[in-house]
From Swiss-Prot:
GO terms for cellular component: apoplast; chloroplast; chloroplast stroma; cytosol; endoplasmic reticulum; intracellular membrane-bounded organelle; plant-type vacuole; plasma membrane. Its EC number is 2.5.1.18. Gene3D superfamilies: 1.20.1050.10, Glutaredoxin (3.40.30.10). This is Glutathione S-transferase F2. Residues 2-83 form the GST N-terminal domain. Expressed in the root-shoot transition zone and root tips. It catalyses: RX + glutathione = an S-substituted glutathione + a halide anion + H(+). Glutathione binds at S12, I13, H41, K42, Q54, V55, E67, S68. Induction: By ethylene, auxin, glutathione, salicylic acid, copper, paraquat, acetochlor, metolachlor and the pathogens P.syringae and Hyaloperonospora parasitica. Pfam families: GST_C, GST_N.
Length: 212
């Protein structure tokens, strides 16, 4: 049976999301490099793995998946008893799982669109020889501040976003945060005490440090 393969780019936020999950589980895998600058993700053979042309794609034996958050959920369930438990303490507790699911949805729809745009403006644009649009940065930082205010309130009640243990809800945030900590946007995290503590906790995890 073939092993685990991740088809993506090591600088991609979505690819990193999957890589961190694999490292948390201490799983062996192969990262198959997809060169985004050359548009390899928009043509075969990659399109046969993800018809929407976005990294990463994933294989575990005969199983083929795409969409990073679906992949991390598969990893968390399929390898629940290996490495770090990325689910709630009682993974069969539907109420606990629903809390974690809310957190994952908030990350996907409220945090990531803003954080990824800020990373693009302040980091990735320079890679492509483009200029940062400071007006866009200001607009997106205002949006991110509102999200982080919600997080600050939540983290005053719990150590992590879904409760007292580290879960996929927290993990999904890590790659974008890693990038933003290297930009002026870092201030939005550091000026909120509990968010700042949470960021330090999740970004210092050994699995997180392996993808920086």
């Amino acid at each position: 049976m073939a092993g685990i393969k991740v088809f993506g780019h090591p600088a991609s936020i979505a690819t990193r999301r999957v890589l961190i999950a694999l490292h948390e589980k201490n799983l062996d895998f192969e990262l198959v490099h997809v060169e985004l600058k050359d548009g390899e993700h928009k043509k075969e053979p990659f399109l046969s793995r993800n018809p929407f042309g976005q990294v990463p794609a994933f294989e575990d034996g005969d199983l083929k998946l795409f969409e990073s958050r679906a992949i991390t959920q598969y990893i968390a369930h399929r390898y629940e008893n290996q490495g770090t438990n990325l689910l709630q303490t009682d993974s069969k507790n539907i109420s606990q799982y629903a809390i974690m699911a809310i957190g994952m949805q908030v990350e996907d729809h409220q945090f990531d669109p803003v954080a990824s745009k800020l990373a693009f403006e302040q980091i990735f644009k320079s890679i492509y020889g483009l200029t940062t649009d400071e007006a866009v940065v200001a607009e997106e930082e205002a949006k991110l501040a509102k999200v982080l205010d919600v997080y600050e309130a939540r983290l005053k009640e719990f150590k992590y976003l879904a409760g007292e243990t580290f879960t996929l809800t927290d993990l999904h945030h890590i790659p974008a945060i890693q990038y933003l900590l290297g930009t002026p946007t870092k201030k939005l995290f550091t000026e909120r005490p509990r968010v700042n503590e949470w960021v330090a906790e999740i970004t210092k995890r050994p699995a997180s440090e392996k993808v920086q």
